[in-house]
Structure formats: C-alpha cells, structure tokens
Amino acid sequence: MIMAAEEVFWRNPKYHAFAQAIRTIPLRERDVKEAEERLRRFAPYIAKVFPETQPAHGIIESPLVRIPNMQRRLEKMFQTNIEGDLLLKCDSHLPISGSIKARGGIYEVLKHAEDLALANGMIAIGEDYAVMASEEFRQFFSRYSLVVGSTGNLGLSIGIIGAQLGFRVTVHMSADAKQWKKDLLRSKGVTVIEHLTDYNKVVEEARRQSAEDPTSYFIDDENSIHLFLGYAVAAFRLKKQLEDMNITVDETHPLFVYLPCGVGGGPGGVTFGLKLVYGDHVHCFFAEPTHSPCMLLGLMTGEHDRVSVQDFGLDNKTEADGLAVGRPSRLVGNMLENVISGVYTVDDSTLYRLLAAMVETEEIYLEPSALAGVAGPVRLFRDSAGQTYVEENDLKEKMKNAVHICWATGGSMVPKGVMEAYYREGMRIETMTGNCFSEGR
C-alpha cells in the first residue's frame, strides 16, 4: 500500500515506555531549559525589531484553540466518532515567519548570534540583548553568513531573522518550494538559489557551499541538535496553555498529538519535549504525504536516512511542499525510534478537503501541509492499526477523556490569492466526492 501511494496507518512496534526510551537519547530536560532561557534572553531584542511580538514581550508563541465545529465536520466527512476534545496548535500563526520553523530556525540563528557576540566581547550574559538591534551589531554580523537548504518554511524563518540581525543569508530552495516564499525572502535581501532537484540534494549542495567559506554557518535541517531543541521548547509552553484552559493530562486523560513531518526535526523536537513533560501520558503520531513518507520508511525498515522514498518507487511529489522530503533525519530517527507512537500518511486530495473544511467551520486558514495533522484523530479511530494501538496501550476506556491536538505547521504568511486558490481546490474535490459542505456548520 505504501508503494502504491495509498493512505496507511502504522503503529510503531518499537514504541517503549519513555523511562526506558530516554536511556538511549543523549539529551535531557536541562538542554531544553537552556534553550528556553536563551530565547528569554533574546526576548527584548525580538520585541524591539518585531513589533508584532510586543504583546507577548518578545516571546514567539502561538495560540492553542478548541475546534469543536471542525471536530463535528470530521465526524460527518469520515463517518467516524472522535472521542474526546479536539484542539489546534496554531504554529501557522506564529509571529515573524508564520510556521513551526519560527521555533527551531529562529532559535538556532539566535544561538549562533549569541555565540559570535560573546566570543568577540560584544555582549555579556545578563546584559540587555536589545542592543543587538544597533547598527554596530548589524555591521558586526554582516561579516558572517548563514546558509540553509529548505523546501520553504525553514528558509523563511532563517532568512527573516538572519537578515534582520545583519547576516548575509543564502537559502537554497528545492524544486517544490512555492514561488511566494522565494519572493518574500528576496524582498528581505536574502539570496535565494533555486534548484531543480529535491530537498535532500539541495541540503547536500548548501552544505558543500557553506564548507568553502570560513565565515559561513550552515544550518543543517537533517542533523541539527539546536533546531531540535528550539522545537522542544514548545512543549513547556504548551503545558502552561493547557493548564490555563483547565485541561488535564494524566493517567486517565491521555493526550494525542498529531504532527506533520517532513525531514522530522520539527515534529521530533516537539515530541521529545512533550515526552519530557508528560511521559507515557502523551502519544505522538507523525503525518506524512502518501508520496513522501520518508520517516515512515526510515522507522519501518530501521534504516533511517539510509533509505529514500525513491527506493520504494515513490516520486516525492506533493502539494504539501513543507513535507516533500525523500530521506528522513538520521538524528530524529535514531533518537526517537522508541518514542514515536506511529506514522500515518495522507493523500493531497484529503489535505485540500480538510483545508476547505477548516475555513468553512472555524475560519482558520492553513497551508496544505498543515492539514496533515488534522487527519490524525479520524485515522486513530477509523484505521484498525489505530484501534490496535489504543487497545494495546490500555486506552480504550480513557478515550472519552482524551485530548487531541493537531499541530498546524504553517499558513498565515500565504498570500491571499494563493490561499483562495487552495480553498477553491478543496471545495472542488469535496464536491467531486459527493460530500459537499452545503449543510452548514
């Protein structure tokens, strides 16, 4: 079924209790807390140069919202009862770059900036980092360059923050990157190099170019611990959001989180953070396009980055540009092979249908890749492998108290015309399936 690019749900047979799984992971909670502390140090700078972050005092965070109308629509569309509450984590609306990549990407650039500033005696820990907005600092950072390979959103986050600090930034974009993302980066003074190859080849080329320049810093989407830790911080923020909403996560109130997955750094970091916070009470599932199930194949075979989707006859072509990755992260696969609960795949047509449904029911606009997570609760309840997971983990009687969080990874930066075209495509597909939304909300 995978090789036929059909939707599948796979439960991970290597999934273990977290106390056991963490023994083979070289990171601990203190590493995530250190990343959180660094982001706090930079908050005055962020608030100064990105006014949209001032209400949150320079902390880059997204809303967590209940989506009951969408929950009912999903039940109707797929003839499936979803037990528990459905929520959306709106990283699609993160300030600065409008995607989950604003977490890891911005964090790694800030860490590099801090390292350079400290090493050159420009600043000391404890001082006000808002001073980095000065021309003196911009001149200093302009002596250095940043290089990254991206399908789109990581390039956006690194390009925007890097250019703001004063770095010379080069973003290598794969063939599937959307034109508007390239245009936006160029408008910020970022050098965009377009490639005709797919994501993994682009990263290889970006890495090679960066290695030739001693002032260059390469942000390695496939293997970066710093990106991973930037994403992991999200879990501690989410814990507070759930508490503020009076939502309990414990033995009898399980939490299910559905995360769109490209190379794996974003969902991997978030999963690690969530496991540190909630242990075995949280269950994390990755969502991939049917044509680009790289993490699924890496985990299933145990070969991780040694296999690609092309090895299995798949073309890695999907409208979910952020997830169009043919080979998974070795770092994430190795670290989390006993931590990820499972992986499911979603067809592009399903993504478009869900995109239109989210607009219709909740008036929330997401890009296609962000909808991969929204399919999760349906798949858990509808697919036999999902139900086997529930039964094997003694969750059946607890599902009525379950909390389901779909992680919306991007969307708010999409130009209006492009978003309208996405919506029309979703409505067109929905009409063809004979499931039109005309019954109202």
From Swiss-Prot:
UniProt keyword annotations, A-Z: Lyase, Pyridoxal phosphate
Cofactor(s), by name: pyridoxal 5'-phosphate
Example of a GO biological process term: isoleucine biosynthetic process
UniProt keyword annotation of DNA damage present: no
Enzyme class: lyase
Highest taxon of source: Bacteria
Residue numbers bearing the N6-(pyridoxal phosphate)lysine modification: K101
Pfam families in the cross-refs: PALP
Alphabetical list of InterPro entries matching this protein: D_Ser_am_lyase, Ser/Thr_Dehydratase, Ser/Thr_deHydtase_PyrdxlP-BS, TrpB-like_PALP, TrpB-like_PALP_sf
Assigned EC number: 4.3.1.18
Catalytic activity: D-serine = pyruvate + NH4(+)
The keyword Lipid metabolism is annotated on this UniProt entry: no
GO molecular function: D-serine ammonia-lyase activity; hydro-lyase activity; pyridoxal phosphate binding
Record-stated family: Belongs to the serine/threonine dehydratase family. DsdA subfamily.
NCBIfam families per the UniProt record, alphabetical: D_Ser_am_lyase (TIGR02035), PRK02991.1 (NF002823)
Protein name: Probable D-serine dehydratase
Taxonomic source organism: Geobacillus kaustophilus (strain HTA426)
Gene: dsdA
